[in-house]
Amino acid sequence: MVTQATSVRWQLWIVAFGFFMQTLDTTIVNTALPSIAASLGENPLRMQSVIVSYVLTVAVMLPASGWLADRIGVKWVFFSAIILFTFGSLMCAQSATLNELILSRVLQGVGGAMMVPVGRLTVMKIVPREQYMAAMAFVTLPGQIGPLVGPALGGFLVEFASWHWIFLINLPVGVIGALATLLLMPNHKMSTRRFDISGFIMLAIGMATLTLALDGHTGLGLSPLAIAGLILCGVIALGSYWWHALGNRFALFSLHLFKNKIYTLGLVGSMSARIGSGMLPFMTPIFLQIGLGFSPFHAGLMMIPMIIGSMGMKRIIVQVVNRFGYRRVLVNATLLLAVVSLSLPLVAIMGWTLLMPVVLFFQGMLNALRFSTMNTLTLKTLPDRLASSGNSLLSMAMQLSMSIGVSTAGILLGTFAHHQVATNTPATHSAFLYSYLCMAIIIALPALIFNRVPPDTGANRHLAR
């Protein structure tokens, strides 16, 4: 007979596998984009929609995931998330055109949006409060391994099999996870307040139309009139949500959040910063393969120092922020990240390839320092009654800004390369160099926002990872 302790342990393993699937997918696809483009007969500089469609879907669906779990139960929502993610992966592998792949990635994104937040909620419900931190450390460890192995695994599969296998690899894990969820996961429910369907639809339309407008010309080939229409639709939708949320206690996100100066600064700074940082995982593998002629596997291996730097930095972030304070850490880390990011193409084009892993290592360190510090700064002064709403809005904003970052990177590459590309040529080097220069400026700009953080804002609570 399975004891309660053993049952909980298996349930934690199920959540951990969900975290692994979701985080692996965020990095494994980037390395494969040039190969996918060649297979589908597309320009590799116009493949950002494959990433944007997934990340944007996650951003749109995040607000509904927690409510669905409370309403239907964590077991059935987590099971549905795994099934959707796995079926979406199968459809991605079967895609014969770019549009088919984008639609399949949307389906994947619906599952991915529910998997991680519902997994966190599951842990809260199945372990005692005093064991929550230890349980979360256990289930998030595979989530840290996913980004570490993703680029190299993606490059290996593309080079020695085909790009289809970066999606097919999810199938056995998904089937096992779905069966284990059915057999072992309890179906905890909670009483729920009324879901703000109107607000959800307004925000979804606003985010989707504005992101599509940004990606419309280079990624989707839309006319200027269509892009203007999307922008107008997005502005109207977001303005309508603001009006809808005024004095509405059932609003998806309370407008009282913006009365908190630190939260508002942190949210605006986080969104601005993640636009720049969101460009890096998309731009770097493409630069290595198209700009420098690296093989997919070699490009994937080159991404590992960035992940190692990120994981290593997380162990000392608390001490760094306690020593220097939020403002100094965020301003200096932001400016240093801009310099380090620009140095990558300079070092590579000058032939100093041995320094590239060092540059990527420091890039990962600075990114992790900014991310964790921004997350905690944003949430640290919120009262308990607004903490859940504030955290959900921050999570949604993070995903949205990363999709904007990928779209922006695609626009820059397409503009400077004039939508024509040849591997490892002076013209291609120039296109990437100008793109990285613009990206470095975008990365540096949030320092102006972070400089407005009060200097006495110190680290008096555990930093968000």
Swiss-Prot record:
This is Putative multidrug resistance protein MdtD. The chain crosses the membrane at residues 12-32, 49-69, 72-92, 102-124, 138-158, 165-185, 195-215, 219-239, 267-287, 290-310, 342-362, 393-413, 430-450. InterPro entries: EmrB-like (IPR004638), MFS (IPR011701), MFS_dom (IPR020846), MFS_trans_sf (IPR036259), Multi-R_MdtD (IPR023721). Belongs to the major facilitator superfamily. TCR/Tet family. GO terms for molecular function: transmembrane transporter activity. Keywords: Cell inner membrane, Cell membrane, Membrane, Transmembrane, Transmembrane helix, Transport. It is found in: Cell inner membrane. It comes from the Bacteria. NCBIfam families: efflux_EmrB, PRK10504.1. It is a multi-pass membrane protein. GO terms for biological process: transmembrane transport.
